[in-house]
């Protein structure tokens, strides 16, 4: 019977979560969904000084916004300390691990001497038990670290789903500390126990973890576990070609939401940031899940391109349901000082203005003209466009608009043409002053569409001002 696929996302809550981080959640999530398996969220919070609940909340918020649902968790490593300590004790009892009393000063001196001899700095196994070996007496009052007895000789081999076959000689690996003097377990050890207990079958993570993998495999095998399939993703680079990070100016995932990006655009963009399905650039969440596989993960670093993301977001804004968009745009309009209630139906306004917008914020900036409370026209613009010679044309326009049997865009456009023909004017001569009077600004979408949305009463009232 084939084992059920189980993947995990295991972030450390030590800062905000950026696009590179969330991509490491998206791929295992998509693979679990594709394989009808389970996606587990594990919070690796053993760095107590740097971890925070606020950072955990941001992770959960980002995943919820992107609709990356979890099947199990979140599990917190700090709540599993008893389990880790029990496994450490078991390993010592089974002689898979041992206490080491070498002080930090002794270890530093050892490494410095090794460097001076041109050797790789490493623990030399002073306290490692061996047949016939006499160990030094434990120093009084010193709490030891616990080290894993890494295999001697041979190598660790795994077929990485991204990088291919990787082989690391055990001679390159010293005996890893798995528990500190106070008994707290170390990162690499906790990861192994978690992956074993949670029956993780596929570990899809950043390639900064490649060096941890041989150590984790050796510990897992010592505990009787079977190593999962590993897929180490190449780094995501920022615009400058540096590794994406907060230090190098990366924005939090929730920052994209607050800037007016749609979750489906972010998911589509991240899916292509290290994976491909032929030449497909735009695809739905359902298509992504259907197509996703480990074989087509990229082997080279992917570079973030904000213009590409903006282009995708524009596509999804244009395709989105107008009622849904209206609900998303409303807070942006209100943040700009607009009052949506009492104005034109926002979904209709969104339908008019959304096509040229790259973000919801840009939709709001254009839509704001329908919801401004202050319609004061700048004197310079009034002097330029609201001249005495144009007033009769505005009055004629208002009279004909007031007589329209139906307030429709096409009929409004026909009235404009009629007035323009009667006065021998071109459209800007009449449209600009009308824009100023009705919208308070010169830049608007098509004037007939704008007047239709404002409604007859508002338009006639403002033209009479």
UniProtKB/Swiss-Prot annotation:
Highest taxon listed in the record's lineage: Bacteria
Keyword annotations: Aminoacyl-tRNA synthetase, ATP-binding, Cytoplasm, Ligase, Nucleotide-binding, Protein biosynthesis
Protein's UniProt keywords contain GTP-binding: no
Region (Disordered): 118-139
Motif mapping: 'KMSKS' region: 243-247
One of the protein's GO biological processes: glutamyl-tRNA aminoacylation
InterPro entries: aa-tRNA-synth_I_cd-bd, aa-tRNA-synth_I_codon-bd_sub2, aa-tRNA-synth_I_CS, aa_tRNA-synth_I_cd-bd_sf, Glu-tRNA-ligase_bac/mito, Glu-tRNA-synth_I_codon-bd_sub1, Glu/Gln-tRNA-synth, Glu/Gln-tRNA-synth_Ib_cat-dom
Subcellular location: Cytoplasm
Gene Ontology CC terms, in alphabetical order: cytosol
Pfam families given in the database record: Anticodon_2, tRNA-synt_1c
Assembly: Monomer.
General function of this protein: Catalyzes the attachment of glutamate to tRNA(Glu) in a two-step reaction: glutamate is first activated by ATP to form Glu-AMP and then transferred to the acceptor end of tRNA(Glu).
Membership in a protein family: Belongs to the class-I aminoacyl-tRNA synthetase family. Glutamate--tRNA ligase type 1 subfamily.
Descriptive protein name: Glutamate--tRNA ligase
Species: Ralstonia pickettii (strain 12J)
